[in-house]
Amino acid sequence: MEKDLSREAYYYHLPEENIAQKPADKRDHSKLMVLNTSTGKVEHKIFNNVLEYINPGDMLIVNNTKVFPARLTGHKESGGKVEVFLLELPTYIRPGVSESIALIKSSRKPKVGSTLTINEALSCRVTEQLAGGKARLQLHYDKDVDVTEILAGIGEIPLPPYIKREEGTTPEDVTRYQTVYANVPGAVAAPTAGLHFTEELLQSLRENGIQFGEVTLHVGYGTFAPVRAENIVEHNIHEEFVSVGQETVDKIIATRKAGGKIWAVGTTTVRSLEFAAAQHGGQIAATEGWCALYIYPGFKFQVIDNLITNFHLPDSSLMFLVSALCRREKLLECYQMAIKEDYRFFSYGDAMAVISGE
């Protein structure tokens, strides 16, 4: 157990060619590794074969957050180029004015009070410098226009830092770096396990008697923050906004009573559900708030049985979470197997199903 708490125990070497730089040709044609934690058996499938494992009466829960066009480019008062990465959806202040927190990339840090011009429709005034290279911004635009409409027209979908392509963000990313069920804007990164689902696959699951539920967790930039603490317990996990509604809670309780399994699509869904239970003495209940739940080996899951996830970065908090379900040694063994079998890793990569098999 002591080794499970050492950051370096989660390191593995990943060849560059295994980092997916673009999505699979079809969402549900990516590879799927299936790990049964009860038997240790590993199977290699195509993602739409997930139908073979989710039984009638089980419940599949997804994160419905939607990535918003958070990356903006413009210029400073001096004329120098500036890149603004909004870390949260702008908050309405009054007509024509909203506020947000952003990372600002430029040759020199803009001063408080300075204006960053994105285009003729949008400018940003720096109102406060914050820690970690962040700044508080006031966004100014036409009072008859919604700021989200402006962002949709001029902003770019932010891709993770390990997607390095000469062409940058493409029109394909606008749809493919978004789940088909995304409907609540607020994330700066996609809940990537959900990228494998198509409308047709979801319909097939419904026809098979699978229940569905939704949660909202707005994935923040902190999801890419490296773990620096040698002992993973000392890592400060990032906060993200979570909402778990009563309808989803009622379905979970009914599924449990009927003997069905709870499937979480993605680590963000796991955190949302387990946070909702932790807030209420281990019993799932409707919850809304800021989640800083940190899951690593030794954690006792109260809600979920099975997990669909992607392959994660070495020694990352997401690896810790998956290891809490399937043992660190087994996870690393699966990752080595995935590299050998040419699986694609990270956001646009292939998937893994971790099932209890009981």
UniProtKB/Swiss-Prot annotation:
The keyword Transferase applies. Pathway: tRNA modification; tRNA-queuosine biosynthesis. Gene3D superfamilies: QueA-like. It comes from the Bacteria. One of its GO terms (molecular function) is S-adenosylmethionine:tRNA ribosyltransferase-isomerase activity. It catalyses: 7-aminomethyl-7-carbaguanosine(34) in tRNA + S-adenosyl-L-methionine = epoxyqueuosine(34) in tRNA + adenine + L-methionine + 2 H(+). It is found in: Cytoplasm. GO terms for cellular component: cytoplasm. The keyword NADP does not apply. Its EC number is 2.4.99.17. Keywords: Cytoplasm, Queuosine biosynthesis, S-adenosyl-L-methionine, Transferase. Coiled coil: none annotated. Transmembrane segments: none annotated. GO terms for biological process: queuosine biosynthetic process; tRNA wobble guanine modification. Monomer. NCBIfam families: PRK00147.1, queA. Transfers and isomerizes the ribose moiety from AdoMet to the 7-aminomethyl group of 7-deazaguanine (preQ1-tRNA) to give epoxyqueuosine (oQ-tRNA). Belongs to the QueA family. This is S-adenosylmethionine:tRNA ribosyltransferase-isomerase. It comes from Desulfotalea psychrophila (strain LSv54 / DSM 12343). The gene is queA.
